[in-house]
């Protein structure tokens, strides 16, 4: 992977996260907002809307930890053989981005998924570190939704549940 700055990574990994239907953005095209750069544009990098357990609509930073993957699932845009630009955040980059967006009131939480790098456990452990660092090191009280990584160790899923408000299972269905 070429060296990318945080903004370039955000553009790639927010765009790659849009294929996850469990956190959909508004999808509006009102007032030519799609593709616009003005106030009210609905194409904010990585911002989506979801519903909290209490029913409130909340804005989330929706990103992938990486869009690189060791698997080659034919239905997945991020499959190993896919000709897409690859990027990968570090744990610290995700933490810094989340806090920066949160402190500016752009978001109320984080939605984090990932391609699988190294192994399912390696990837899930990195995602858990993001949530744990936000909660314990930064006293983050915002919402955290983690997509679990298939075949990750049950202990990692249990630990993820200690820090995330919501866990969801990554079940892919071809269309």
Predicted regions and their residues:
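Core AdoMet radical
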Residues: 79-94, 102-128, 133-175
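Flexible, acidic/Gly-rich N-terminal and inter-domain linker regions that tether
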Residues: 1-68
């Amino acid at each position: 992977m070429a060296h990318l700055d945080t903004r370039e990574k955000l553009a790639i990994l927010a765009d790659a996260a849009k294929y996850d239907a469990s956190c959909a953005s508004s999808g509006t095209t009102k007032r030519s907002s799609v593709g616009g750069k003005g106030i009210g544009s609905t194409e904010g990098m990585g911002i989506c809307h979801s519903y909290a357990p209490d029913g409130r609509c909340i804005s989330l930073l929706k990103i992938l930890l990486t869009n690189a993957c060791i698997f080659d699932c034919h239905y997945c845009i991020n499959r190993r053989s896919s000709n897409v630009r690859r990027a990968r955040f570090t744990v610290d980059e995700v933490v810094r981005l989340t806090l920066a967006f949160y402190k500016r009131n752009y978001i109320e939480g984080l939605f984090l998924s990932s391609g699988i790098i190294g192994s399912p456990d390696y990837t899930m452990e990195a995602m858990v570190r993001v949530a744990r660092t936000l909660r314990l090191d930064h006293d983050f009280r915002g919402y955290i939704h983690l997509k679990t990584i298939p075949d990750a160790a049950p202990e990692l899923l249990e630990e993820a549940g200690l820090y995330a408000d919501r866990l969801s299972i990554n079940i892919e269905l071809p269309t």
